[in-house]
Amino acid sequence: MNIPFLKKNGIKEFKLKQIKSDASFRKYFRIYTKNKSINLLLVRSPKKKENNLGYIKTANILEEMNLSVPKIIDYDNKKNLFLIEDFGSQTFKNSLKNGVDEYKLYNLAVETLIYIYKWKINLKKKLPLYSEKKLINEALLFLEWYWPFIYKKKPSQKTIDEFIKIWKFLLKKNLKSKKILVHRDFHIDNLFFLKNRVKLRSCGLIDFQDAV
């Protein structure tokens, strides 16, 4: 399976084991040679469904910040394949189950967010702007999902218009605030506890392709 792509990266005799993936069209395969993992993942990520270029751009920015993201070994745009570093299975969620101190993990996550907020980097030409339109579209998910659940019907156009008007008012100050990188999917399944790394680098970040 996909032998040429792996062979050109020096991986000849191998076995692939598909691992549980997130809610996306990506598929992840752990690579084994001689029954041992080599800490690399083969990722099939269809560019028509996934933001592959956004992933690469954001990975480069986070690396520039000296944060831990899976190192991209190779990318084949035509075949929609990535070869990336394997962070293993110790997500924050699994780490909590395995007895890692809860305060330690949550403090690490918060300190990582603070560090990103303070980082001085010009993102205007690198990532999409978290615009009013994008923010309102995300707020509208409330009406799309929660409103019908409570009221057993879809919201009227009048309700939608009033909802948008309220959010436009609330977002005025927000849109004038400092422009920073926003991960947009920062939660315990997308954070890894890398115990062999120090300080903020012990927080591994994934699933950041839609960052703004």
Where are the regions that the model predicts?
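Juxta-kinase regulatory segment immediately upstream of eukaryotic protein kinase catalytic domains
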Residues: 1-15
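An alpha-helical support segment within catalytic cores of ATP-dependent transferases
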Residues: 2, 121-128, 133-134, 138-182, ...
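ATP-binding glycine-rich phosphate-binding loop
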Residues: 11-32
